[in-house]
Amino acid sequence: QIVVGNGGKQLIFNALLASIDPEDEVIIPTPYWVSYPQIVNFAGGKSILANCTESNDFKISPKLLEKLINKKTLWLILNSPGNPTGSVYSKRELHDLASVLRNHTNVNIICDDIYSKIIYGNKKFFTLAEVAPDLIDRILIINGLSKAYAMTGWRIGYAAGNLSLIKAMIKLQGQSTT
């Protein structure tokens, strides 16, 4: 249920390319890492930008998430700590988002945790999988070594998730990078 790749970007690319059908939607909280919408578009999906404001520390609220989910929603991308804001979802915030996601079994979650070891102040990192283990079959965790260990040129990332998705990602990676 794990695949290693050439950085988190390749793994997000592989996951979306392996799973998105035309017209599938991906919810992306703003501000966002520049590549998310481009990867979604390349995979044939539609990016749904969730306008997250400074008043909520640039994090998606359960209310906004509920408003944006529909039958076409395939993925939610959660980046915590966030790039470019550094915003970190608390355990309570993740719990509240999980409460919404439990009602929408069509929605999978990419937890881009690449900055999990780079946190400032007294904030603590949690990933959705530890807060809501009942959603584990719908969660894809993305992480890597480059950011946490100052190895930016090494491009070593890993993804952990549902076995069928991981197998599809491995198949795609085997045809594109070996």
What residues fall within each predicted segment?
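Phosphate-binding glycine-rich loop
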Residues: 1-25
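Hydrophobic residues at beta-strand termini and immediately following loops
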Residues: 5, 50, 128, 142
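Conserved PLP-anchoring active-site segment centered on the Schiff-base-forming lysine
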Residues: 18-40
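A short helix->loop->beta-strand "cap" motif at the edges of active sites that frequently abuts
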Residues: 24, 45, 101-108, 136-137
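Short beta->alpha connector loops at strand-helix junctions that form conserved
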Residues: 30, 49-53
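Active-site phosphate-binding strand-loop segment of PLP-dependent enzymes
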Residues: 53-122
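Conserved core segment of the aminotransferase class I/II
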Residues: 132-178
